[in-house]
């Protein structure tokens, strides 16, 4: 049963480390389970750290400490071309690095720096500070700087009161939002109930208010249709009046021509011939 738990712990620590540090398949090298079972003071994994990248070191250390119920240690080492980090479940076999952990630590070639959770807590400006991050920077020549960045308040009581104020403000805003959502849902339910039963009065006014947004577009479309039909009727009436006038004038002209033709036909024409 203990071996099964160790295997689960092994897989959990490896997956959590890759997830938290966002490691690729070529960024780390893990130690086999059989070798760890024979000598548990070997590192579980060795990681090649990138430059100018913020690693969430305190979060990973806290997770390892919670899973293993022990005091894990991360050892930083300058290999000459990069900085590696070896993750140990226990203290390493040989003491590597006796330097005190500070915010900025200079590592020369083959020098090591061992970091524990107590070292991180000692660097934090306050108990309620955010998780400390680790950044590797190139210094000069073949030296590197291991920098630990921690943010936190200098006054704990002021920080706690500020957190309470922010939390209460968010809670009040959340309650107002929840109440407004409940009111809108109740209004929709009442309006749908009124529309189904066809009731009028005060409940009908609520239904009209609730459905005003839905029917506004329909009313606008109906208004435009009425306006269009009215304008087309006015245009048609104007055209019909113009056509009537033209027809009357043409009829009068034809009647005048016909009257002239009749008069000319009834008038006798003088006889033509030689005068005696």
From Swiss-Prot:
GO terms for cellular component: host cell nuclear inner membrane; membrane. The chain crosses the membrane at residues 246-264. Residues 265-276 are nuclear. Phosphorylated. It is a single-pass membrane protein. It comes from the Viruses. Disulfide bonds: none annotated. It is found in: Host nucleus inner membrane. Residues 1-245 are perinuclear space. Keywords: Host membrane, Host nucleus, Late protein, Membrane, Phosphoprotein, Transmembrane, Transmembrane helix. Plays an essential role in virion nuclear egress, the first step of virion release from infected cell. Within the host nucleus, NEC1 interacts with the newly formed capsid through the vertexes and directs it to the inner nuclear membrane by associating with NEC2. Induces the budding of the capsid at the inner nuclear membrane as well as its envelopment into the perinuclear space. Forms a heterohexameric complex with NEC1. Belongs to the herpesviridae NEC2 protein family. This is Nuclear egress protein 2. It comes from Human herpesvirus 6B (strain Z29). The gene is NEC2.
């Amino acid at each position: 049963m203990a071996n099964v738990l160790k295997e689960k712990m092994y897989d959990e620590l490896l997956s959590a480390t890759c997830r938290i540090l966002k490691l690729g398949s070529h960024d780390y090298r893990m130690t086999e389970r059989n070798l760890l079972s024979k000598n548990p003071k070997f590192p579980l994994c060795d990681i090649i750290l990138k430059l100018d990248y913020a690693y969430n070191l305190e979060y990973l250390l806290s997770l390892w400490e919670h899973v293993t119920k022990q005091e894990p240690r991360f050892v930083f080492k300058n290999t000459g071309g990069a900085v590696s980090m070896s993750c140990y479940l226990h203290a390493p076999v040989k003491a590597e690095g006796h330097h005190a952990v500070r915010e900025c630590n200079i590592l020369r070639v083959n020098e090591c720096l061992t970091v524990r959770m107590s070292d991180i807590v000692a660097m934090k400006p306050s108990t309620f500070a955010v998780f400390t991050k680790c950044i590797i920077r190139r210094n000069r020549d073949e030296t590197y700087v291991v920098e630990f960045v921690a943010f936190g308040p200098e006054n704990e009581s002021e920080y706690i009161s500020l957190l309470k104020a922010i939390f209460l403000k968010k809670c009040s805003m959340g309650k107002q939002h929840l109440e407004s959502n409940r009111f809108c849902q109740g209004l929709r339910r009442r309006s749908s109930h009124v529309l189904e039963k066809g009731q009028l009065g005060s409940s009908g006014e609520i239904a009209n208010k609730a459905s005003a947004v839905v029917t506004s577009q329909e009313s606008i479309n109906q208004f435009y249709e009425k306006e269009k039909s009215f304008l087309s009727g006015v245009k048609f009436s104007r055209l019909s009046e113009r056509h009537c006038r033209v027809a009357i004038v043409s009829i009068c002209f034809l009647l005048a021509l016909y009257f002239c033709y009749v008069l000319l036909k009834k008038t006798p024409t003088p006889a033509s011939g030689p005068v005696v």
